[in-house]
């Protein structure tokens, strides 16, 4: 049970100025060698009425002195018992540690609170872990002096590489530099990958410092070609990430901002990089900018990126229109067509034609149709000219999904044939019209009209097939004579011959 005195001590935040040393000792609010002790807020104490300490700092000092009474008081003031362990280690009070050992789940949890390397190592020793674990934790908590102390143990290149990469990941710059300059490491150039992955400029500069201190055997700084190649590779990776300042730092040491580098900036839509090197530095010719534009089409660059590249060309693309169309058709990304159409450069029709030629699915082409609001008759006529009957059927299934719509399709197609000039295209549509006819019911007059339609467009096969259906209809012979007149006027010998045969058997 708590005494009334304990409760008062725990919650008393203001000491009367009249309390002398004797009363403070009686209340348990006196700290030997330090003076009065009072709580001023949840995480701080007042010592001798003029020194403010955090509760945990006071706890550490008390533990280093072995003052269990003050420790107990500070713990009641919400101090962290981990600082008891830290203070006890500083003062070599292992008996005190033994009293609190049951509350400690893992000594590694205390390491982050320790500032002193000697105390850090003592604490780690209590966990009964090995030297490798100590070194890893020393990196994690930036204890360079521990690595320096145990340098003679760090002789394995593979393990040193792991430590180097860990230091880079943890962004412990002093340790990174020390390992790079002091220990044998397999792949010190991995620092550049980490710097780019984390977008860490400090790590990048350390990497170049190590490189030009000749600490990277994989790159010969005295071989200009090898150095330029490596630095250009860094520029390319930086362009992918959009790390503009990384590129400027790299260029201080060498490398070339070439087409491969800027193509990555286009692919990943890093316009700041493009604007700096193309507009300000003027490092590309018009032909190279055109190639970048085509690269952007290939890699699905955004509207803003494509607009930027087009602006460098003053939106003049006459010389590469054919290539633009080819790239769009090949890659299936028509963003550039949207951009150009806004600038009154219309490439919709040649691209649509190319999509049909390359057997793009109707689902894809439908996106294109919707984007540019293309009229259905234009799509069907183009598909008919190319003999893409399946695509026409898919299109009709999309806009006329019900069987009741077949008559509407029938009339629509007949009207298209009236306005179409392309002979092969007409044949495709007439073939489809006849298929629809076989699935719908027509009145006698409508069948005769269809027969006349076939004669007008010299559709001999469909004409013969329909004649078989009309043979027994009243008025068929007079109508055949009318059809014969049309065939003679238009000089359709096959239909003329077939009509004459039919008239013989009538």
Swiss-Prot record:
Pfam family, one: DUF249
UniProt entry keywords in alphabetical sequence: Early protein
Taxonomic superkingdom: Viruses
Induction: Expressed in the early phase of the viral replicative cycle.
InterPro entries recorded: MGF_505
Statement: the UniProt record of this protein carries the keyword Transmembrane helix: no
Record bears the keyword Lipid metabolism: no
Family: Belongs to the asfivirus MGF 505 family.
Purpose: Plays a role in virus cell tropism, and may be required for efficient virus replication in macrophages.
Protein name: Protein MGF 505-4R
Species this protein is from: African swine fever virus (isolate Tick/Malawi/Lil 20-1/1983)
């Amino acid at each position: 049970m708590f005494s009334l005195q304990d409760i008062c001590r725990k919650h008393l935040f203001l000491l009367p100025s009249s309390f002398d040393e004797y009363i403070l000792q009686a209340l348990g609010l006196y700290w030997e060698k330090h003076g009065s002790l009072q709580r001023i807020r949840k995480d701080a104490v007042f010592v001798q009425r003029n020194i403010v300490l955090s509760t945990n700092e006071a706890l550490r000092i008390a533990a280093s002195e072995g003052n269990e009474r003050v420790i107990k008081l500070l713990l009641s003031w919400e101090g962290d018992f981990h600082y008891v362990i830290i203070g006890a280690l500083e003062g070599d009070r292992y008996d005190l540690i033994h009293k609190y050992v049951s509350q400690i789940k893992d000594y590694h949890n205390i390491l982050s609170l320790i500032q002193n390397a000697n105390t850090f190592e003592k604490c780690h020793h209590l966990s009964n872990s090995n030297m490798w674990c100590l070194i890893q934790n020393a990196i994690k908590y930036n204890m360079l002096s521990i690595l320096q102390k145990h340098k003679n143990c760090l002789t394995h290149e593979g393990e040193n590489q792991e430590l180097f990469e860990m230091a880079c990941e943890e962004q412990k710059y002093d340790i990174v530099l020390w390992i790079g300059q002091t220990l044998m490491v397999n792949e010190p150039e991995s620092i550049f990958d980490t710097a780019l992955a984390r977008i860490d400029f400090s790590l990048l500069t350390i990497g170049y410092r190590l490189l030009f201190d000749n600490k990277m055997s994989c790159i010969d700084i005295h071989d200009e070609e090898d150095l330029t190649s490596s630095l250009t590779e860094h520029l390319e990776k930086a362009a992918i990430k959009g790390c503009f300042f990384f590129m400027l730092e790299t260029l201080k040491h060498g490398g070339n901002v070439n087409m491969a580098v800027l193509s990555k900036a286009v692919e990943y839509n890093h316009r700041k990089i493009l604007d700096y090197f193309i507009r300000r530095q003027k490092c590309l010719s018009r032909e190279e900018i055109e190639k970048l534009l085509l690269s952007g089409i290939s890699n699905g660059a955004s509207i803003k990126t494509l607009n930027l590249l087009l602006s460098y060309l003053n939106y003049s693309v006459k010389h590469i229109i054919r290539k633009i169309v080819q790239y769009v058709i090949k890659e299936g990304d028509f963003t550039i067509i949207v951009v150009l159409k806004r600038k009154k450069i219309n490439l919709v029709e040649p691209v649509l034609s190319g999509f049909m030629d390359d057997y793009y699915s109707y689902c894809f082409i439908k996106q294109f149709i919707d984007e540019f609001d293309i009229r259905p008759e234009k799509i069907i006529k183009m598909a008919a000219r190319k003999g893409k009957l399946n695509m026409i059927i898919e299109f009709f299934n999309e806009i006329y999904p019900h069987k009741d719509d077949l008559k509407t399709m029938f009339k629509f197609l007949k009207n298209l044939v009236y306005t179409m000039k392309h002979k092969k295209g007409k044949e495709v549509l007439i073939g489809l019209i006849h298929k629809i006819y076989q699935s719908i019911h027509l009145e006698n007059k409508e069948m005769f009209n269809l027969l006349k339609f076939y004669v007008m467009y010299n559709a001999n096969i469909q004409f013969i097939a329909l004649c078989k259906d009309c043979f027994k209809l009243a008025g068929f012979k007079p109508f055949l004579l009318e059809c014969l007149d049309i065939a003679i006027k238009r000089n359709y010998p096959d239909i003329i011959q077939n009509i004459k045969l039919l008239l013989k058997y009538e």
